[in-house]
């Protein structure tokens, strides 16, 4: 475990980095803890199989008095693989999250932000452990894998004929590693995953971890729109009405996890707020960083000021 201290905007921030022992394996975490603050944000990266690295812009929220916790989920980034292959599930992920919450924040409630697959994990957590939440943020997340895949297939139909034809051809052959197919997949990503000319280094690190580990392939599949892993049938849309904590839903206009997916969640969580980032695809925290952080900060400020409830 390591520590270092920084001071920003008058806040004293202790950055703690290390491992927590959870269910017999080491889970990596990084905590930006603000002296004297009880406002807690826990972040969930996507994948499944990514790492916390690409979410690091959210660390800036500690400059405004918000404790920010990042971690690499089981089988991801710097964390260990689960001991049992049957643990590559969303259910195991939410129990891991609850154990980490207890170890880091004790009895304190949290605001939970999940991005992409992390948004699905955040929803699953809220459905079981809502009593520990001050608020929920579903950022380019989903409540139904089948519906999300259906929406991604619609986006493929809107691609230029060249790429659409290539994707369909190699999918029919079951050849997901052909260079021509991978080139078409990368074009899809350039439109709907990240629309920046240069990929930021933290995003590169996350993709490097995805390539090194087996979690993405086990839980998801060969790529973003071919989901054949353990999460392929996951759908909790009909349970969303049970979520009653303040909820923010964000999505990019060009998102691979589409606006329609976000609207489905918004429609089923009473009182939720939906924000669409007009110049973003799947990574608004990079594509519209300042606006994204402003929206997240505003929501957290509102959640912690509501009747001054603790």
Curated annotation (Swiss-Prot):
The active site is at residues 116, 255, 282. NCBIfam families: pro_imino_pep_2, ProImpepThrmp. It is an enzyme of class 3 (hydrolase). Residues 41-288 form the AB hydrolase-1 domain. It holds the Pfam family Abhydrolase_1. Part of the tricorn proteolytic complex. It comes from the Archaea. The gene is pip. It catalyses: Release of N-terminal proline from a peptide. This is Proline iminopeptidase. It comes from Saccharolobus solfataricus (strain ATCC 35092 / DSM 1617 / JCM 11322 / P2) (Sulfolobus solfataricus). The keyword Hydrolase applies. Cleaves H-Pro-AMC as well as a wide spectrum of amino acid substrates and several peptide substrates without a proline at the N-terminus. In conjunction with the three factors F1, F2 and F3, Tricorn degrades oligopeptides in a sequential manner, yielding free amino acids. SUPFAM superfamilies: alpha/beta-Hydrolases. One of its GO terms (biological process) is proteolysis. GO terms for molecular function: aminopeptidase activity. Keywords: Aminopeptidase, Hydrolase, Protease. Belongs to the peptidase S33 family. Its EC number is 3.4.11.5.
